[in-house]
UniProtKB/Swiss-Prot annotation:
GO terms for molecular function: ATP binding; metal ion binding; nucleoside diphosphate kinase activity. Its cofactor is Mg(2+). ATP binds at K11, F59, R87, T93, R104, N114. Homotetramer. One of its GO terms (cellular component) is cytoplasm. Major role in the synthesis of nucleoside triphosphates other than ATP. The ATP gamma phosphate is transferred to the NDP beta phosphate via a ping-pong mechanism, using a phosphorylated active-site intermediate. Keywords: ATP-binding, Cytoplasm, Kinase, Magnesium, Metal-binding, Nucleotide metabolism, Nucleotide-binding, Phosphoprotein, Transferase. The lineage of its organism: Bacteria, Pseudomonadati, Pseudomonadota, Gammaproteobacteria, Aeromonadales. Pfam families: NDK. It comes from the Bacteria. This is Nucleoside diphosphate kinase.
């Protein structure tokens, strides 16, 4: 199996509920290592740029507004099949459809306030990691 990196956001709703540690525990229990992390309060420009692919969609303005409503925790995760594993841990985008025990089933409020974000493919992971982290900020743990 291939060692991959993926990008992850703990969104404002989960940060405000003090769920960072619980979510990190799930990542690490699944064999994913945090190799870069920082807390930030996204500016409108950062959020708009990050979610540029959704511009023009009905939910775009609300998404940018939500993602700038409070601090987020962003991280790079590394491990075997990290993208697939992370997406399994997160669960379906709509928490009503998420399997029991997934992050969204446990912690999400709604499809709009769904606790976490994760890259969906290697290309998006590379783009999203580079959007927020320089190479010098990433610390492989072997």
């Amino acid at each position: 199996m291939a060692i991959e990196r993926t990008f992850s956001i703990i969104k404002p709703d989960a940060v405000s509920k003090n769920l960072i540690g619980a979510i990190y525990n799930r990542f690490e229990s699944a064999g994913l290592k945090v190799i870069a992390a920082k807390m930030l309060h996204m500016s409108s420009e950062q959020a708009a740029g990050f979610y540029a692919e959704h511009q023009g969609k009905p939910f775009y303005d609300g998404l940018v507004s939500f993602m700038t409503s409070g601090p987020v925790m962003i991280q790079v995760l590394e491990g075997e099949e990290a993208i697939r594993r992370h997406r399994e841990i997160m669960g379906a985008t709509n928490p009503k459809e998420a399997l029991a025990g997934t992050l969204r089933a446990c912690f999400a409020e709604s499809i709009d306030r769904n606790a976490v974000h994760g890259s969906d493919a290697p290309a998006s992971a590379a783009r999203e990691i580079a959007y927020f982290f320089s190479d010098a900020e990433i610390c492989p743990r072997g």
